[in-house]
């Protein structure tokens, strides 16, 4: 059976490559980018992932963190052993808890075209949604119910702007 053509070729050392740079590049690629800034700052590359998370007071394995109680055949109560995990970096845990407790603000906004459309409809027809459905600016032929939903969405997403608009109408 014939041999592959270039399989027996002698390997040559490439003097053009910077080995130090290649090693740094490999290490950087092998260590993933940690998105959370608190964990990233407290991370120690010399320690394992499990050890790093244990030092911060975080769980590496959720099955070990909250183990399921096994049902035993005998009724003798076995006391669970207390956890010996010592949190070396509690500030990370405190910062994560503080960040999680902050209320998340609603970032949903409507397009300027939709805001302009709703304002035109209210300016022309007030609360008459049937008349809005017959309006010539109703390009997408929205039903009265769809227009009512768009107005309600505008009220919910931009309450101050909606109130200011109603005051400007008089």
UniProtKB/Swiss-Prot annotation:
Indicate where this protein resides in the cell.
Answer: Nucleus, Nucleolus
Q: Name one GO biological process term.
A: ribosomal large subunit biogenesis
Principal location listed in the UniProt entry:
nucleus
Keywords in alphabetical order: Nucleus
Query: Which InterPro entries does the record associate with it?
Result: Ribosome_biogenesis_Nop16
Stated family:
Belongs to the NOP16 family.
Designated name of the protein = Nucleolar protein 16
Species in which this protein is naturally found: Tetraodon nigroviridis
């Amino acid at each position: 059976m014939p041999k592959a053509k270039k399989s027996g070729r002698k390997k040559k050392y490439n003097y053009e490559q910077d080995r130090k740079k290649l090693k740094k590049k490999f290490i950087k690629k092998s260590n993933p980018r940690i998105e959370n800034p608190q964990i990233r700052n407290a991370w120690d590359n010399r320690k394992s992932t499990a050890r790093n998370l244990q030092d911060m007071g975080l769980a590496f394995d959720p099955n070990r963190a909250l183990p399921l109680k096994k049902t035993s055949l005998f009724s003798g109560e076995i006391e669970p052993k207390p956890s010996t995990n010592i949190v070396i970096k509690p500030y990370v845990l405190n910062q994560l808890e503080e960040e999680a407790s902050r209320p998340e603000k609603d970032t949903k906004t409507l397009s300027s075209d939709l805001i302009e459309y709703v304002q035109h409809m209210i300016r022309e027809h007030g609360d008459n949604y049937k008349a809005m459905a017959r309006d010539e600016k109703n390009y997408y032929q929205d039903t009265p119910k769809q227009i009512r939903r768009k107005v309600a969405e505008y009220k919910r997403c931009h309450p101050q702007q909606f109130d200011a608009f109603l005051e400007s109408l008089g």
